[in-house]
Amino acid sequence: METVYIAGGCLWGVQHFFDTVPGVQMTEAGRANGTTSSLDGPYDGYAECVKVVYDEKNTSISELMAHLFEIIDPYSLNKQGVDVGKKYRTGLYSTDPRHLEEARAFINGREDRDKIMLEVLPLTNYVRSAEEH
């Protein structure tokens, strides 16, 4: 099993979507790359995200990226739908450099690559979200 963290706006809708993607074994709502490990307090730079555990024999980072691009506006910076703010930015985060390389290759293989605002970065911090939002 492999784990990647995907940001696509409001985390609950993204989590619900990835729960239906073939090859995904488990999802969990959370926050990526904030500066604290607390859910309380002022905004600390995090992106709302979904921890996605998947079977690499049944799906890949490129396939997960293709699914993500079905539900986001990849050209939008810090905004998805009615949700506006830096925490709603789009991104893919991982502690595995291979995941980041594959995500970057997916973007670089697209004709619209220069317009894409989705960030691909190492995961530096993850905090699981509360059960209620």
Q: Predicted regions span which residues?
A:
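Flexible coil/turn and secondary-structure edge motifs
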Residues: 1-133
